[in-house]
């Protein structure tokens, strides 16, 4: 059962805080996909996104009693999630930071013709699509964490500037200005280097073997290909408004959304089955 309105959220929250385990489970089920997808965009890999999503959802359910209804519940959750993700230091790219300069040099200097066929009998088109999905999230790691968050909220989640500004504690005007600058930066890079959307030399199909050789793509472990997609309609309950986007950075809006992995779902099934509700609601 999907929770679609603030009134419904309030009803389930009141029940959960009062000790209703079913209500708490309903809240987690309705949040976990949104939290996982936000984590994936911010951190760039499925394993890191899984770990962060678990941390965020635990923060949410252990602080439910502090929600005062001064904003929409989903806005409150986004605020917790973005604050956690902006300061998250345990993910891969926190240890190996990227830049647009590094990414561009890698594209320019890769000797694709010298790499043998490494596809391991997996269709090249499938691997190219996997690489495309992975690249869109990894490319975002070239932005600093706050800029990445601004871009993700505005371009992928399409949040209204008033809501996004509230989440990030900035005015709508300041948010729009920063989002515009960040979009232009991403669009300029895509235009210069990406052959899928711009005039650049990088094409996913041609880069598959190089990506496998450099351990950026594993034919035996295709996270995006094997993930279960969810429909845009299922994510729409988290969006308060839509914004028009008119540059190449809008291409990131095509990114698919996914169900949180089964490991995360199982973690919370076991947690909710074993945890004392008093420990949760009184934390």
Feature annotation, model-predicted:
Residues 28-47, 63, 89, 142:
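Amphipathic, Lys/Arg- and hydrophobic-enriched alpha-helical face
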Residues 37, 51-58, 71-83:
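Structural recognition of an alpha-helix C-terminal capping motif at a helix-to-coil junction
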Residues 2-3, 17-26, 36-55, 172:
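Short, charged helix-capping/linker segments at alpha-helix termini
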Residues 1-7, 97-149, 159-172, 181-283:
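Intrinsic, short, N-terminal disordered tails of RNA polymerase sigma-factor systems
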Residues 17-18, 42-45, 57-72, 91-93:
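Sigma70-family region 2
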Residues 49, 175, 179-182:
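Helix-turn-helix DNA-binding helix
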Residues 65-69, 82-100, 188:
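Arg/Lys-rich amphipathic alpha helix in sigma70-family domain 2
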Residues 32, 36, 57, 85, ...:
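C-terminal flanking helix
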């Amino acid at each position: 059962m999907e929770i679609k309105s603030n009134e419904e959220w309030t009803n389930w929250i009141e029940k959960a805080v009062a000790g209703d385990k079913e209500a708490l489970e309903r809240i987690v089920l309705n949040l976990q996909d949104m939290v996982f997808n936000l984590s994936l965009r911010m951190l760039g890999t499925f394993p890191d996104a899984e770990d962060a999503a678990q941390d965020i959802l635990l923060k949410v359910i252990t602080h439910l009693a502090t929600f005062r209804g001064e904003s929409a519940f989903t806005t409150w959750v986004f605020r917790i999630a973005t604050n956690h993700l902006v300061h998250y230091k345990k993910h891969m790219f926190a240890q190996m930071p990227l830049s647009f300069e590094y990414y561009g040099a890698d594209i320019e200097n890769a000797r694709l013709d010298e790499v043998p066929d490494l596809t391991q009998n997996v269709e090249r088109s499938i691997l190219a699509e996997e690489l495309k999905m992975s690249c869109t999230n990894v490319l975002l790691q070239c932005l600093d964490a706050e800029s990445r968050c601004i871009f993700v909220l505005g371009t992928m989640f399409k949040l209204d500037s008033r809501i996004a500004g509230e989440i990030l504690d900035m005015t709508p005007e300041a948010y729009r200005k920063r989002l515009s600058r960040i979009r232009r930066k991403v669009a300029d890079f895509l235009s210069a280097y990406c052959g899928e959307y711009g005039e650049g030399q990088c094409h996913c199909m041609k880069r598959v073997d190089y990506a496998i050789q450099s351990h950026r793509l594993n034919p035996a472990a295709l996270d995006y290909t094997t993930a279960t997609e969810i429909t845009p309609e299922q994510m729409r309950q988290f969006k308060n408004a839509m914004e028009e986007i008119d540059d190449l950075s809008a291409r990131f809006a095509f990114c698919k959304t996914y169900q949180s992995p089964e490991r995360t779902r199982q973690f919370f099934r076991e947690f909710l089955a074993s945890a004392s509700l008093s420990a949760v609601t009184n934390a």
